[in-house]
UniProtKB/Swiss-Prot annotation:
Organismal lineage: Eukaryota, Viridiplantae, Streptophyta, Embryophyta, Tracheophyta
EC number: 2.7.13.3
PTM field: Activation probably requires a transfer of a phosphate group between a His in the transmitter domain and an Asp of the receiver domain.
Reactions listed under catalytic activity: ATP + protein L-histidine = ADP + protein N-phospho-L-histidine
Protein name, UniProt field: Probable histidine kinase 6
Gene that this polypeptide is encoded by: HK6
Membrane side Cytoplasmic: residue ranges: 1-12, 328-970
């Protein structure tokens, strides 16, 4: 009992001591901060007072210097010139015009030194008599100082003897004895009623030495220059230019008589003691007078809040420290409780993630299932006998449905990316064929807009690479689609090269190291830019000089065209740099920071004018990062945009299956190998792109700027002579063709043939961007080729033009007939709870001769597939009532295992060959997330077909399964 009491008493004593220490610390801090504040205030007062005193002296000195200069002027032009070059009018005009140099002087006047014996002659010469300050005749005295020249502002001083006044006489005597400016006592100036002083300066005759004695100065004195100095105006002007005037009070005193200082400026000092006060000495150059400036604060410096808040805060902190120590264990208990709650939240978050996946699966299935029915029925409708109007309506509805499916897929892709469940494939694919396929998607749109659309792949890029072609295509489709959408004139140019080459060449262009140029954008003679279309591009590095570095230094050899350069290297990674350049509207500067934000567009008008949801770029950025690259852009409003992304892929190894490559690309024909052609194109970038596609077919191309040069090349002029018997084609760009003049050049072709210079006329091919160009110029040519050009489309046109017979490839057989031979008579079971989907799938398979049986539940499917059965394949919906597709497939596999075991035992007893029974089961669902695919494989399904599917997807899947079943049976 005693110990707790003692402990309590000790705690009370410690608490009291703690409070006393806290109070002492706070009190000391208050005193210290208050002392520091007063010291800083005093330092500031001293600084401001000294600064004002220094500037006052400087301004006073400047005015004195101007008066001194005026004295020298009088000495020079009044005494050295005979007759004098200065009279009253001259003096008045000069002083009036130069008064801006003496703003603090009310006026200046010059008084000449006259001895008594010269007075009569002087007065006769001037025509007036000297007067005193009281306007009376000057009494006789040893010498006089009558004012002979005066500024108009002090014209009342004319004829007055300045020696008649006692104080003025003393100033004159001191001024000529010292050679310096001397001042009077302060007095009220006439006119302004301001306090001021009279400044007097002696004027000496020329030739006075600088170290002259007093007697020599007095002897050489010729007159006196004086002016009224407005001290109040001087100080007011000074203080108006300085900061802090509202804080301090300035007084200027004449302290020649220290016991009775005379105020020259400022209010009267308050009665009582002033806490902060500073005196600065003023030196106005008069050795006989003393002046000083006295400064004080207008109000007592306030006590800073820190002197109150800091001590109070310190006291509070001391109190809080004690409280914190006491509350430490309580805090520990609270942290333990928070940890427990966090564990619960973690469990809830994991459950939410599972729920999110289930929600995505459900939403995907519920949306895509009816869309599958809509699109399937539209496909079936288009296969019937429709009028043109009905067919147009159905095709429009089909296009809208596919656009909706694309949007759904984009949203689901974004969700899969955020959930970290998007995986990339690694399969070999032909990069150049894929690029051509992407460009072909937008060919009709580019022709409608009359814009150039082209693709170029550098020679050092491998032909076959390993990666995910579908995701690679998705990025390209998004970027090229945006470029075409936002471009109304000019071009869209897709370029693929190796990243390491792209960086080096771009730096060379940026630093201006190529061909001795300064790195500026090169233009043609007519002012157009050296780009694909002649319009300016956003990225100024992408000019012709940069593009030349991407081209091979020599024409590709025919042998090189046949072999795949990717097989010359071992399997390794390659980083591709793909840029999509357009000359569209560009991206506004304020919107460039949110370009890759999902569902965000530049502004509200973007969606109205161009459509779209703003999710494509976000997905493209995520996919590029998943491929080990990144995406960036350069955009200039009303000029265009250039999007660049990189992707890390693998080179295809030597042992890569040729069948895999054939399935991913269409082999180009070799019938055109060795042919020669001339391309007439005035734009070097576009000409290089066209030559690239022709070179892929084995055609050797020479590019010229105009048709005249082409004919000269054809005729063997300018030192160039092509092999005439092999020159098969003459390609001409539509914007180069000038019918009124170039038709004469074509007539020249016939003359060359008639003269024997050309054995056979080449075929004329016109390259056009739109239907209008074909209608305008096409009649003069053998064939018109629409852009964007691809190697396959060129081959098709040239086959028609040159009547070239190409061997039919095995894989170019009639696909429907081939599939009919595979599927005819096959028994296929379709399981789906949606009757519309059943009709769509059944119609697609029946079209190729398959025998289709449909059921609407998993239980019915299990009953029909009891061993033995007659079905060759089964399409199984995943989400169905009562029994879903997963459970139905598991039961089917269990029945197969049991039946195979029984059959195997029976075959062993009979000595016959055992053939395992396996029914191909393909998942058929609208759920496209990775978790569903994994569940399909886990349950025993053989494949996966997502809804909405088309006929192509159906027959490819079935043919693969049927062929696989045949091979396993053999």
């Amino acid at each position: 009992m005693g110990k707790p009491e003692a402990r309590s008493g000790w705690r009370n004593a410690a608490a009291a001591a703690w409070v006393l220490v806290a109070v002492a610390c706070a009190a000391y801090m208050h005193w210290h901060l208050r002392r520091e504040t007063m010291d800083r205030a005093e330092e500031r007062l001293v600084s401001m007072c000294e600064e004002r005193a220094r500037m006052l002296q400087e301004q006073f000195g400047v005015t004195v210097n101007h008066v001194h200069a005026l004295a020298i002027l009088i000495s020079t032009f009044h005494f050295e010139k005979f007759p004098s070059a200065i009279d009253q009018d001259t003096f008045a005009k000069y002083t009036a015009r130069t008064s801006f140099e003496r703003p603090l002087l009310n006026g200046v006047a010059y008084a000449q030194r006259i001895f008594h014996h010269e007075r009569e002659m002087f007065e006769n010469q001037q025509g007036w008599i000297m007067k005193t300050m009281k306007r009376q005749a000057a009494p006789p005295q040893d010498e006089y100082a009558p004012v002979i020249f005066s500024q108009d502002t002090v014209s009342y001083l004319a004829r007055i003897d300045m020696m008649s006044g006692e104080e003025d006489r003393e100033n004159i005597l001191r001024a000529r004895a010292t050679g310096k400016a001397v001042l009077t006592n302060p007095f009220r100036l006439l006119g302004s009623n301001h306090l001021g002083v009279v400044l007097t300066f002696a004027v000496y005759r020329p030739g006075l030495a600088a170290d002259a004695s007093v007697e020599e100065r007095v002897e050489a004195t010729a007159g006196y220059l004086g002016g009224a100095f407005d001290v109040e105006s001087l100080v007011e002007n000074l203080l108006s230019k300085l900061a802090g005037n509202q804080d301090i009070v300035v007084n200027v005193y004449d302290v020649t008589n220290a016991s009775e200082p005379m105020a020259m400026y400022g209010p009267q000092s308050p009665d009582g003691k002033v806490s902060l006060f500073h005196v600065s000495t003023l030196d106005f150059g008069d050795p006989f007078r003393a002046h000083e400036m006295r400064c004080r604060y207008r109000q007592k410096p306030p006590l800073p809040w820190s002197a109150i808040t800091n001590p109070l805060g310190t006291f509070v902190i001391w109190m809080l420290v004690g409280y914190i120590i006491c509350a430490a264990w309580s805090r520990y208990d609270k942290v333990s409780e928070d940890c427990r709650k966090m564990e619960e939240l973690k469990t809830q978050a994991e459950a939410a993630d599972v729920a999110k996946s289930q929600f995505l699966a459900t939403v995907s299935h519920e949306i895509r299932t009816p869309m599958n029915g809509v699109l399937g029925m539209l496909d079936m409708l288009l296969g019937t006998d429709l009028s043109m109007t009905q067919k147009d309506y159905a095709q429009t509805a089909q296009m809208c449905g596919r656009a909706l499916i694309t949007l759904i897929n984009d949203v689901l892709d974004r969700a899969k990316i955020e959930a970290g469940k998007l995986e990339l494939e690694a399969v070999p694919f032909d990069l150049r064929s894929l690029m051509d396929d992407v460009i072909s998607l937008f060919s009709s749109k580019s022709r409608e807009k009359c814009i150039e659309l082209a693709v170029f792949v550098c020679d050092d890029v491998p032909k076959v690479v390993i990666g995910d072609p579908w995701r690679y295509r998705q990025i390209l489709t998004n970027l090229v689609g945006n470029a075409v959408k936002f471009t109304e004139r000019g071009h869209v140019f897709v370029r693929v090269c190796l990243a390491e080459n792209s960086k080096v060449e771009a730096n060379q262009v940026l630093n201006g190291t190529m061909n001795g140029k300064d790195g500026k954008v090169e233009t043609t003679a007519n002012g157009a830019f050296n780009t694909l279309s002649g319009f300016q591009a956003a990225d100024e590095r992408n000019n012709w000089d940069y593009f030349k570095l991407l081209l091979s230094d020599k024409e590709p050899h025919m042998d090189e065209l046949e072999c795949d350069r990717s097989y010359q290297n071992d399997c390794d990674c390659v980083t591709l740099m793909i840029s999509i350049e357009d000359t569209g509207v560009g991206i506004p500067l304020h919107a460039q920071d949110r370009v890759f934000t999902p569902f965000m567009q530049a502004d509200s008008s973007t969606s109205r004018n161009y459509g779209g949801t703003g999710i494509g770029l976000s997905i493209s950025k995520c996919l590029a990062e998943l491929m080990g690259g990144q995406i960036s852009f350069t955009s200039r409003p009303f000029v265009g945009s250039t999007f660049t992304f990189s992707a890390v892929l693998k080179r295809s190894c030597k042992d890569t299956s040729s069948d895999s490559k054939r399935s991913l690309s269409e082999a180009l024909p070799t019938a055109f190998k060795g042919m020669k052609a001339i391309l007439v194109d005035g734009r070097p970038v576009r000409g290089a792109v066209t030559r690239y596609h022709l070179n892929r077919l084995g055609i050797v191309v020479k590019v010229v700027n105009n048709l005249s040069m082409g004919l000269q090349t054809l005729a063997g002029q300018n030192g160039v002579k092509e092999s005439r018997e092999k020159l098969s084609m003459l390609f001409i760009e539509s914007d180069i063709w000038r019918p009124e003049t170039d038709i004469l050049l074509l007539n020249r072709l016939h003359e060359l043939k008639n003269n024997g210079q050309v054995h056979e006329l080449p075929k004329l091919v016109l390259l056009v961007t739109s239907e209008a160009d074909k209608d305008r110029y096409g009649s003069a040519f053998d064939i018109v080729m629409y852009k964007p050009i691809r190697a396959s489309t060129i081959a098709s046109c040239l086959q028609q033009l040159l009547k070239v017979v190409m061997p039919e490839r095995k894989d170019n057989q009639n696909r429907p007939s081939f599939l009919r031979s595979l599927l005819i008579g096959k028994n296929i079971l379709i399981v789906d709870d949606n009757k519309v989907n059943l009709r769509v799938a059944a119609a697609a398979l029946k079209k190729y001769g398959a025998k289709v049986h449909c059921v609407e539940s998993g239980k019915d499917a299990v009953s029909l597939l009891q061993q033995p059965h007659c079905f060759d394949a089964c399409f199984m919906d995943v989400q169905m009532p009562e029994m879903d597709g997963f459970e139905a497939t598991r039961q089917i596999r269990q029945m197969e295992v049991k039946a195979n075991e029984e059959r195997k035992a029976l075959d062993l007893m009979e000595g016959s060959t055992f053939v395992e029974s396996h029914l191909p089961v393909l998942a058929m669902t609208a759920d496209v997330i990775q978790a569903t695919y994994e569940e399909c494989i886990k349950s025993g399904m053989d494949g996966y077909v997502s809804k909405p599917f088309d006929e192509e997807q159906l027959y490819q899947a079935v043919s693969r399964l049927v062929v696989g079943t045949k091979e396993s049976a053999v």
